[in-house]
Amino acid sequence: MILFLSIQVSVSQILSEKDRAILKDELLEDRFQNLLPQLMDDANLDMWLLISREYNEDPVLKTMLPARWLNARRRTMILFYRNKKQNTIERIAVARYDIGKSIKSAWNKELEPNQWKALSDIIAKRNPAKIGINYSKHFALADGLVKTDYEELVKNLPDSLVSKLVS
């Protein structure tokens, strides 16, 4: 016996590509404002880093990008800083450009040509107690920080900050 299911969908119920992009970006902003602070608090993280390269993205990174971004660009660095006293989350791109409307660029390549040094300076200025990075022996989706980027991160951070890295 073969069963056929018929789903009736009117054209008016399907969002246009533009409207889907708007909805996705609204949902992303909601996650940044409401879900991310709680998750960082639950994990006892003051800071969380996402570092990816074009064509080799951290699986989590794609869930943090706006609708019109399909991938990382060159080396994409995103830093989330949770200030519990002020109940805020800074969303910073260590990139030459903003990542959509939700993540603002904090790197001026003309003033500091070294992206890793710029990242290190931004982290040091905030002096977090715990810095989350994505690596895991047990969960593939939590193992997005590639070895090369991990080594560059450790090489460019002062020892006082390297000791604060956790996964």
Model regions: which residues?
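A composition/biophysics-driven feature that prefers long, compositionally simple stretches
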Residues: 11-167
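Bacterial Sec-dependent N-terminal signal peptides
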Residues: 1-13
